[in-house]
Amino acid sequence: MGQKIHPTGFRLAVSRNWASRWYADNRDFAGMLAEDIKVREYLKTKLKNAAVSRILIERPAKNARITIYSARPGVVIGKKGEDIESLKKELAVRLGVPVAVNIEEVRKPEIDAKLIADSITQQLEKRIMFRRAMKRAMQNAMRLGAQGIKIMSSGRLNGIEIARCEWYREGRVPLHTLRADIDYGTSEAKTTYGVIGVKVWVYKGDTLGRNDLPAVETPRPDEERRPRGPRRDGRPGGDRSGAGRGPRRPAAGNSAPADGSDKPAGAGGADNTAVKRVRKVAAPAAPAADVKGE
């Protein structure tokens, strides 16, 4: 049974980049990675209502720089920047180094996989039907320029006793194409009857390199077909529709016989009378006459 590899990890260093960009020695790597995980969990809880798409953590020399991509940057900044200042102080205490926080706005949250998954889970927690939430998200994504989207929900859907998985897809989502810009996001809905997981794949086109380059829209196969041009040898051959042609001449050996039989008629006017060959067999010799008298 084929399994789906993580689209972001599959495309690292090809069309995607790492979410944590720093280098460390072997003895410091585990501690710094644990700090990154704790910082992401803290920001996920702190900025739950800010529609955070992703968090980029960079560590220059004895400093830290955190970039938060949010669809609602005003919620992160707060009134007169009060919230972001308190956020900087808290992150500096957790990391132990001075922290610079940058806020980047997500222009189209409808085609961001993480924000789509979070939106669906919020609707599921409000007891909205999962099919309605999934199809509405797919329609919005395709309307705003996505070339394909796939959404999968797993768990006790609608509160049934046996968990199952349902997915819907619109457009095309090429998971094996490395140059395809596939945005992938997951989220969990904590309902009264259990946890429901949501996965979202969004295909935005083909990229020329890293994800900071613009996506290239790939034409469909039916759009690539072009009308035929003139022949190289000068003979007319561009229009093959058959307009202006006369009636076709019957082939020499394919005309039906006049007698209505199913055998093809022979070419030319030769006599087609069948000749039956008979093999001559020698007659048996007569018995010798009896010369004795009576």
Swiss-Prot record:
Pfam families referenced in this protein's UniProt entry, alphabetically: KH_2 (PF07650), Ribosomal_S3_C (PF00189)
UniProt-annotated stretches for the region Disordered: 210-294
MF terms in GO: mRNA binding; rRNA binding; structural constituent of ribosome
Gene Ontology biological process terms in this record: translation
Keywords, ordered alphabetically: Ribonucleoprotein, Ribosomal protein, RNA-binding, rRNA-binding
Organism: Verminephrobacter eiseniae (strain EF01-2)
Compositional bias of kind Basic and acidic residues: 219-238
Biased segments, Low complexity type: 249-258, 281-294
PANTHER family named in the record: 30S/40S RIBOSOMAL PROTEIN S3, SMALL RIBOSOMAL SUBUNIT PROTEIN US3C
Entry similarity comment: Belongs to the universal ribosomal protein uS3 family.
Lipid biosynthesis is among the record's keywords: no
Alphabetized CDD domains for the sequence: KH-II_30S_S3 (cd02412)
Domain KH type-2: 39-107
Subunit structure: Part of the 30S ribosomal subunit. Forms a tight complex with proteins S10 and S14.
Top-level taxonomic group: Bacteria
UniProt protein name: Small ribosomal subunit protein uS3
Gene Ontology CC: cytosolic small ribosomal subunit
Protein task: Binds the lower part of the 30S subunit head. Binds mRNA in the 70S ribosome, positioning it for translation.
